[in-house]
């Protein structure tokens, strides 16, 4: 497995060829195959290798706006909003575990992209969902790109996340969530992006924000923190590219993935939304990796 430190200000832009096709799908109007699955908004643009984009907690598919033009010019890209987020269906309280999110993606692929596989790229919570899907249904997943995904955190970081999880239970998610976001930014992060993240979270249904965070890191079946995360990642057979911001995390995770095409990179001069703080560099890196698969 390769492991690199991307401590660069900017890398050269890809020389892109081809033109993105016109939008071919916008909203899935039918419930996917699994009972209880949500109607998901998604766009389906381009031709070539199938790539699916999953956003993070209290976000939406617009997070990938810096990547979509490049990706859609090279690949077939399905960018979706997870249940309760963006323009997708808001499901009732009690249906926001990682397994619920995975079931939606599984149902979407089997119902609308039968017999097809995807490189699944997820940010934050979306990175963990992508990994869980790869574990449950490797027949649907070619590889995973985890953009600072919710995996591989130390127990010490887990204790910090516990404060947020506890705060979400009784506090105002519109205050608790942005306070966590503040700890995840870099000097490179635009004030406009920070404000957008906060306002978007505050416009997400409160029960969605409250109930989605904790199960990523706590309780039976969590795979985001400590030895449970390591044990889970070691079971994955698909190529896995994890981009993170912490050297100690990268050092831990560099031996966890079995595929020789897997890699773990440390990215400096970026906050948690690496793909927004360093978009050109990220676009080059992910395209180069996907093209090796």
What are these regions (language model features)?
Residues 270-279, 283:
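Catalytic histidine-centered segment of alpha/beta-hydrolase-like enzymes
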Residues 155-157, 171-233:
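Conserved alpha/beta-hydrolase catalytic His-Asp/Glu region
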Residues 45, 79-121, 125, 129, ...:
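Active-site loop/oxyanion-hole signature of alpha/beta-hydrolase fold enzymes
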Residues 44-91:
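Conserved HGGG/HGGXW glycine-rich cap/lid loop of the alpha/beta-hydrolase fold
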Residues 135, 143-172:
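Flexible "cap/lid" loop of the alpha/beta hydrolase fold
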Residues 237-273:
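Conserved loop-alpha-helix segment in the C-terminal half of the alpha/beta-hydrolase fold
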Residues 127-138, 144:
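Short glycine-enriched nucleophile-adjacent loop
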Residues 1-12, 16-23:
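N-terminal secretory signal peptides
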């Amino acid at each position: 497995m390769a492991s690199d430190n991307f401590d660069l200000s900017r890398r050269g832009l890809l020389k892109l060829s081809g033109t993105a096709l016109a939008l071919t799908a916008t909203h899935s109007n039918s419930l996917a195959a699994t009972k209880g699955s949500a109607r998901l908004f998604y766009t389906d643009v381009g031709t070539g290798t199938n790539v699916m984009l999953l956003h993070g907690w209290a976000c939406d598919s617009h997070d990938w706006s810096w990547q979509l033009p490049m990706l859609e010019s090279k690949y077939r890209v399905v960018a979706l909003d997870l249940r309760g987020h963006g323009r997708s269906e808001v499901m009732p309280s009690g249906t926001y575990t990682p397994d619920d999110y995975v079931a939606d993606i599984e149902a979407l692929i089997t119902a609308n992209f039968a017999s097809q596989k995807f490189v699944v790229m997820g940010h934050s919570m979306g990175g963990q969902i992508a990994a869980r899907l790869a574990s449950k249904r490797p027949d649907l997943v070619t590889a995973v790109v985890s953009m600072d995904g919710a995996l591989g955190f130390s127990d010490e970081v887990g204790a910090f996340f516990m404060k947020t999880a506890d705060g979400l239970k009784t506090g105002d998610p519109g205050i608790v969530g942005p306070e966590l976001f503040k700890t995840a930014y870099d000097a490179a992060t635009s004030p406009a992006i920070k404000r957008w993240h906060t306002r978007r979270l505050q416009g997400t249904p409160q029960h969605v924000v409250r109930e989605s965070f904790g199960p990523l890191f706590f309780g039976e079946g969590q795979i985001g923190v400590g030895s449970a995360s390591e044990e889970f990642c070691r079971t994955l057979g698909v190529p896995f590219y994890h981009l993170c911001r912490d050297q100690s995390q990268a050092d831990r995770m560099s031996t966890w993935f079995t595929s020789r095409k897997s890699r773990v990179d440390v990215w400096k001069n970026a906050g948690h939304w690496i793909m927004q703080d360093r978009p050109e560099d990220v676009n080059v890196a992910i395209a180069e990796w996907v093209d090796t698969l």
